Amino acid sequence: MDDTMDESVNETAAGTGETDFRVLGPVEVFDRRTGTYVAPSGAKQRALLGALVVRAGQVLPGERLIHELWGERPPASAANALQAHVARLRRLLQQALGEDGISTQATGYTLGRPGARTDAHHFQELSSRGRGTLAANPVRAAELLGGALALWRGTALEGSGQGPLCAGEAERLEELRLTTLETLYEARLRAGRHAEAARELERLTARHPVRERLYDLQMLALYRCGRQAEALGVYERARRRLVEGLGVEPGPALRARMEAILHHAPSLTTPDPDASLHELGGAIARLGTRIEALAREQQGLIRRLNSLTSGVTGQGPPVERGHLLEQGADVEG
């Protein structure tokens, strides 16, 4: 997925355990024997697996699956063909997942356990955590949101056909992906990464020409880089694309942003909670750790001095910490 940004995802996307199914791209099954993902062969197999994963833990009636695989005008042999596809897919899942396969119910089929994990679940969890962290720590929010986007390998449920279940879920996930992408750039702006965001949003607005939020973020990024005229030019470009593409004018939020930029509204330059605050917090924490380490070193020096001087005849009382500190102050002063 070209929109996935280059945020580090080692601590957010790794170490969480493998998911049973991957749907953020071609649908795949995690093979517990080999530790790899495998894909069903054939378009109907992928469409069947996609539909069952979308409704994992729920009974899917045979009629609905027939409609998913063959549309409004299924062949007369669709019921028998569905049974054959289920049998082949069941063998694949039993080999890959063990007992967590397809079960036959009175009215249809159920895939595995209700809690079957997918990469879509992981994506939504990371995205939610990123949004929840945005106000307090935009740097961390950007890491989480970047990790969520890095899970995408292509179009959701790619190759699973255009049946209503798979197509509807793919559309829902794509909207969540774009919303997460927009929130990622909000986090970057809050963290003070204006020039970087302005460059990348130029490309993203070209790829998604009717996403007003992306234009809004690009205008703010450019303005904070001191490029007011370019920011206003983005508004005109957005307006033209919206009129040509959808036949509508920009919404109130984008118009308000244009007016604010035109009149240099103070709110545009009021710094959001940015990276400097969090970097300062990190620096303070590192300083505290260093002070503790120095204190331990000082205690070790005191013990060594006392050990060295204890055997010397006529030696006075042991060196005390306060005295050593005073000596250090005298040297520095």
Model features per residue range: what roles?
Residues 38, 74-78, 108-333:
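Intrinsically disordered, charged and Pro/Gly-enriched terminal/linker segments
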Residues 51, 68-71, 88-95, 129, ...:
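Amphipathic alpha-helical regulatory segments at dimerization interfaces
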Residues 1-44, 100-108, 115, 289, ...:
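Short boundary/linker motifs that mark transitions into or out of structured domains
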Residues 36-69, 89, 215:
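Short amphipathic alpha-helical recognition elements used for nucleic-acid or partner binding
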Residues 67, 84, 91, 233, ...:
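DNA-binding alpha-helical recognition surfaces that contact promoter or target DNA
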